[in-house]
């Protein structure tokens, strides 16, 4: 059987095969770019290079820098909200709950330090992304106000305005993202313990119940 001319042989499709884009991977790449060069270092082109995909592939999922910031925002806020909500639900003792929340916030400030200030400051951030961050921060603040109120009621914190107190604690913990330097070798645990000591102004925490006691208490509700 005669062979078809070479110029009639099946041709390989042009371009790379379409790849599914993992939004978590995109968020990781954007966070890495922030850490390397700040807000100006973030772009669709550089994110594609970080992910090892073609620009055309990434453009099908995210076409603008604003989209990239939105993905990082959603991942960061959802993770923080889920972890805070889980802590509040799993710890009955108010003192332990506040201590755990402060530790969580210290960890977030350290891990998100390259871009946390960008969202809170709003400088250079697209209006829609900043508006979503502002809306989320109000809801997140309510979680903190509830924890602070419980601690005031039980005497772990001095009585006062729980909203102002919650904002002051959050402000203190967010500021960690501005001054933290890995080379100083200050651990998250040290930051959390020092912050907790400051919040309670040196007063010892009230006796805490054991985990088994907390579980029994839940069963009696």
Question: How should these model regions be labeled?
Answer:
Residues 97, 108-128, 145, 178, ...:
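Amphipathic alpha-helical segments used for helix-helix packing
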Residues 71, 85-111, 166-169, 212-215:
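Hydrophobic alpha-helical connector segments
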Residues 56:
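Key DNA-contact positions within bacterial/archaeal DNA-binding proteins
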Residues 1-37, 41-50, 67-70, 217:
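Basic, helix-initiating cap at the start of DNA-binding domains
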Residues 20-28, 40-41, 49-52, 60-85, ...:
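An amphipathic alpha-helix adjacent to DNA-recognition modules
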Residues 1-14, 141-153, 172, 178, ...:
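C-terminal peripheral helix-coil segments that are non-catalytic and often amphipathic
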Residues 99, 103, 145, 162-170, ...:
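Short, well-structured alpha-helical segments
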Residues 78-81, 128-154, 163-167:
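Amphipathic alpha-helical packing segments from all-alpha helical-bundle domains
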């Amino acid at each position: 059987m005669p062979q078809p001319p070479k110029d009639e042989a099946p041709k390989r499709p042009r371009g790379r095969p379409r790849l599914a884009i993992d939004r978590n991977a995109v968020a990781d790449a954007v966070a890495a770019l922030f850490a390397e060069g700040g807000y100006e270092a973030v772009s669709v082109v550089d994110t594609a290079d970080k992910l090892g995909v073609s620009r055309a592939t990434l453009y099908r999922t995210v076409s603008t820098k604003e989209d990239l910031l939105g993905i990082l925002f959603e991942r960061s806020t959802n993770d923080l909200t889920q972890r805070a909500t889980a802590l509040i639900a799993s710890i009955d003792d108010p003192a332990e709950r506040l201590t755990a929340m402060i530790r969580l916030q210290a960890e977030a400030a350290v891990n998100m330090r390259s871009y946390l200030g960008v969202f809170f400051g709003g400088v250079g951030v697209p209006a829609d992304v900043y508006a979503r961050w502002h809306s989320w921060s109000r809801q997140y603040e309510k979680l903190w106000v509830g924890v602070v109120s419980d601690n005031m009621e039980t005497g772990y914190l001095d009585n006062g305005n729980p909203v102002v107190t919650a904002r002051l604690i959050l402000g203190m913990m967010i500021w960690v993202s501005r001054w933290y330097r890995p080379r100083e070798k200050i651990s998250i645990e040290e930051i959390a313990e020092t912050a907790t000591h400051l919040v309670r102004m040196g007063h010892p925490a009230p006796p805490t119940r054991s985990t088994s006691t907390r579980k029994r208490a839940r069963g009696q509700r």
